[in-house]
Amino acid sequence: DGDVDEMDFRYHGPIPFSKETAVLMMADSVEAASRSLADKTEESINKLIDNIIDAQTKDNQFVNTNLTFRDITVIKKVFKKKLQNIYHVRIAYPV
């Protein structure tokens, strides 16, 4: 049987109730998913962050918070910059 039930992999706890808990949820999801990226380019990191946070927004995960669309845009921008800094390729220096 190749069918996968999405509900088996969803968190069944309460949705975030404050801006802070929403940001923690976003950060945890983005950080965990970024570890599985084979190609950690700026484009792939940006796409990953947009997809995850957009899906959480569409899934009404932030309805109990006071987050605005502007807040979410700023959060995405910060996450993108931070992850790009973490995963940027360093030049090999002679030893």
Where are each of the predicted segments found?
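Terminal helices and disordered tails flanking the catalytic cores of nucleotide-processing hydrolases
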Residues: 1-95
